[in-house]
């Protein structure tokens, strides 16, 4: 009998869970972003403008779902220059996605963190009066308090671009109760960073902090569309498997781990059968099985051939595993980590 880690029914929906529009420091309007991403096969777009949640229900149609969300920044405010391109110290960024479509109340509101066009939307900000002018301080205690408040406020919390942020192990390993982290971030990659965060993900998992992994563009679209090497859309994404394209079905699928992160490769099925972890995928050069064990496992192709299926026998002491696909073109797909014995 098969035990599916990613549900076997429903449809996969392509999602960008990190996106900036003219509401903050992006160049494209929310409507322009919808048109662009729909053209490229996306069904879900989280409008994660900086430090302000502005919903876009008018953009909803049968083939496109906007998610209510924002990117919350934590840094040492008195070191912040307030201007794009300037340096500031000690940042941590969190993506907050409202689980329910009618949730527009931000947590940990602080108007001093608004910049670029976001300052023009302050009058539309919705938040609990008890959290007005929340004192954001770059400490693990404060960041954990924000995460907990976000959960109580009905948000799915993603740890964004740890490589871009320059956060180090002794700090980020103290973060607790994250729902997911960005294993890839395309804007950071386009800037020149190696924002493939396998190591950070494993750090959390090995420390007992279980979470999913996602990927997003973090697009700002300041360069000519598609032709410029720094164009930062449609590079990394999250595939979400859900029964239908409805708001709560999509956020519930994220919560349940019915998703994978990619920059080109695909995972079609992931399940356990006869004591083995089995995965079917797009044409791959290599499929690897990573766990809490000292030794990973891998299946490789011979020259001129490709893999579309792999299976692995877990070690008896494996507590969790994750799968990584390396396509013949060098593109990746990352499964979430899943517990083996539950």
Regions found by a protein language model. Give the residues of each.
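C-terminal functional module detector
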Residues: 1-9, 208-212, 217-342
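A metal-dependent hydrolase metal-coordination microenvironment
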Residues: 2-156, 160, 167-168, 184-199, ...
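Histidine/acidic-residue-rich catalytic or RNA/ligand-binding cores of hydrolases
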Residues: 25-28, 168-177, 193, 222-242
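A general structural signal for stabilizing positions within well-ordered secondary structure
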Residues: 36, 172, 204-205
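Alpha-helix termination/capping residues and helix-transition junctions
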Residues: 39, 175, 207-208
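Glycine-enriched alpha-helix->loop->beta-strand junction motifs that scaffold or abut catalytic
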Residues: 41, 63, 176-181, 235
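Extracellular structured ligand-interaction cores
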Residues: 42, 91-94, 154, 178, ...
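Functionally critical loop-and-helix segments that line ligand-binding/catalytic clefts
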Residues: 198-204, 219
């Amino acid at each position: 009998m098969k035990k599916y880690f990613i549900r076997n029914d429903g449809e996969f929906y392509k999602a960008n869970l990190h996106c900036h529009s003219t509401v903050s420091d992006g160049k494209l309007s929310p409507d322009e972003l919808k048109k662009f991403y729909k053209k490229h096969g996306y069904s879900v777009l989280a409008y994660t403008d900086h430090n302000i949640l502005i919903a876009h229900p008018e953009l909803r149609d049968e083939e496109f779902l906007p998610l209510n969300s924002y990117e919350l920044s934590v840094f040492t405010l008195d070191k912040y220059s307030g201007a794009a391109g300037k340096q500031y110290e000690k940042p941590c960024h969190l993506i907050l996605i409202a689980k329910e479509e009618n949730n527009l109340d931000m947590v940990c509101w602080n108007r001093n963190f608004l910049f670029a066009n976001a300052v023009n939307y302050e009058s539309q900000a919705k938040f609990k009066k008890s959290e007005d002018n929340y004192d954001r301080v770059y400490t693990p205690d404060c960041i954990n308090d924000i995460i907990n408040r976000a959960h109580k406020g009905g948000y799915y919390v993603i740890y964004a671009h740890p490589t871009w942020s320059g956060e180090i192990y002794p700090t980020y390993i103290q973060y607790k109760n994250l729902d997911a982290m960005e294993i890839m971030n395309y804007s950071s990659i386009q800037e020149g960073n190696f924002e493939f965060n396998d190591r950070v993900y494993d750090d959390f998992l090995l420390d007992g902090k279980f979470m999913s992994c996602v990927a997003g563009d973090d697009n700002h679209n300041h360069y000519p569309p598609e032709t410029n090497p720094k164009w930062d859309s449609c590079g990394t994404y999250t595939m979400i498997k859900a029964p239908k394209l409805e708001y709560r079905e999509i956020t519930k699928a994220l919560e349940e781990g019915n998703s994978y992160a990619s920059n080109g490769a695909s995972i079609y099925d992931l399940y356990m059968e006869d004591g083995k972890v089995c995965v079917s995928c797009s044409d791959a050069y290599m499929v690897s099985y990573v766990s809490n064990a000292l030794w990973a496992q891998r299946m490789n192709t011979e020259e001129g051939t490709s893999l579309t299926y792999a299976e692995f026998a877990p070690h008896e002491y494996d507590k969790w595993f994750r799968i990584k696909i390396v396509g013949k073109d060098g593109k990746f797909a990352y499964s979430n980590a899943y517990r083996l014995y539950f």
